[in-house]
Amino acid sequence: MWNYEKRLQYPINIKNCNPTLAAMIISQYGGPDGELGASMRYLSQRYSMPYREVAGLLTDIGTEELGHLEMVRTMVHQLTRNLTMEQIKGTPFEAYYVDHTVGVWPQAAGGVPFCAIEFQSKGDAITDIAEDMAAEQKARSTYDNLLRLCRDDPDVYEPLKFLREREVVHFQRFGEAMSIIQSKLDSKNFYAYNPEFKK
């Protein structure tokens, strides 16, 4: 189904190690609003989506989120690849180092491991797309928080800014998907029934 291109969606060339920033950015890998959950959410929801164009959108955005996942992992790797023990000690990355050294593993900034309970595939077109819109806004908020933490390093700031912009685009696309779904339902009551389970 997929063709892998050996390049990132946005170039990442981080020159300076920063274990503290890596410990924060990793949340967009395996945190509650991260790219791993987003990709799995959309690629799971597409199967029961009754509207072909919306199922296609879920596939497209879910696939793009896999690319964002690769970007976040690359950032964490580049921020930690040449660390010394002196740079690690006393930083938020120190606890992560104990379990993973400098391997890239999905967890939130607070150390909570990724869990599939953080995303849903409800089997209801309206419910799922409403969740997707909320998920994109939560991810945008997380990127806003990360951007405030790294203004002094353009090598980190610019890729994060790109990822934040994509969250806004995805939110808009899911808004369009909601309009498509609603246009196919009873306009007097959009919530009268589940269009994925008409029984």
Give the predicted meaning of each segment.
Residues 1-199:
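Non-heme di-metal
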